[in-house]
UniProtKB/Swiss-Prot annotation:
Keyword field contains Cytoplasm: yes
Composition skew (Polar residues), residue ranges: 1-18, 215-235
Name the UniProt record assigns to this protein: Protein GrpE
Assigned GO CC terms: cytoplasm; peptidoglycan-based cell wall
Residue ranges of the region described as Disordered: 1-50, 198-235
């Protein structure tokens, strides 16, 4: 018994489409118009353009990723160096009190010889190698960034210049970081310009010359008087 809805074996129900890709119509003999996208060369050109655009896009993405990684690496190295500097500064800061004791011993003459002198020299050499620099000496210009004034002599008037007169405690600097300010006493000194100093020197020289001339004239007068007294009278 056969189902009425069942199609014969010869008819599968699929439609077969046949495309005539001949450029010349066999019936009319005319050249058929083919769209650019349907031409064999047009498809290859479009694929090549698309590939170039994709390569350019991926290249730009790669360059951005490389730039981001380079910036990240720089930041990581900078942060690592900053952490190392902070750790080094923390350790060195704890040794500043030892340096103060050694400085007092040096002023008392206790470091002229002996094992303590060797220890002090080695410690100074090691800290200097790390970049530790001491500052604050008598006669230096006062710098509020480096020095802390606990005494001040002078009125600080116009033309005066503050200099360090007394050092109570040395300051220390590690690289560009100030570990401890120097405690100093400040003295105001008068600044004299070179031209003003030269004019003062010239005036002093003129005054000295005038005094010498007056002294010479006085000596000449005394000599003439003595000669007149020593001559016999004519009577």
């Amino acid at each position: 018994m056969t189902d009425g809805n069942q199609k014969p074996d010869g008819n599968s129900g699929e439609q077969v489409t046949v495309t005539d890709k001949r450029r010349i119509d066999p019936e009319t003999g005319e050249v058929r118009h083919v769209p650019p996208g349907d031409m064999p060369g047009g498809t290859a050109a479009a694929d090549a353009a698309h590939t170039e655009d994709k390569v350019a896009e991926l290249t730009a993405d790669l360059q951005r990723v490389q730039a981001d990684f380079a910036n990240y690496r720089k930041r990581a190295l900078r942060d690592q160096q900053a952490a190392a500097d902070r750790a080094k500064a923390s350790v060195v800061s704890q040794l500043l009190g030892v340096l103060d004791d050694l400085e007092r011993a040096r002023k008392h003459g206790d470091l002229e010889s002996g094992p303590l002198k060797s220890v002090a020299d080695k410690l100074d050499s090691a800290l200097t190698g790390l970049g530790l620099v001491a500052f604050g000496a008598e006669g230096e210009d006062f710098d509020p960034v480096l020095h802390e004034a606990v005494q001040h002599e002078g009125d600080g008037g116009q033309g005066s210049k503050p200099v360090i007169g007394t050092v109570m405690r040395q300051g220390y600097q590690l690289g560009e970081q100030v570990l401890r300010h120097a405690l100093v006493g400040v003295v105001d000194t008068v600044v004299v310009d070179a031209a003003e100093l030269e004019s003062v020197d010239d005036g002093t020289a003129v005054a000295d010359t005038a005094e010498n001339d007056q002294a010479d004239q006085g000596n000449s007068a005394d000599t003439s008087g003595e000669q007149a007294e020593s001559e016999p009278s004519g009577s």
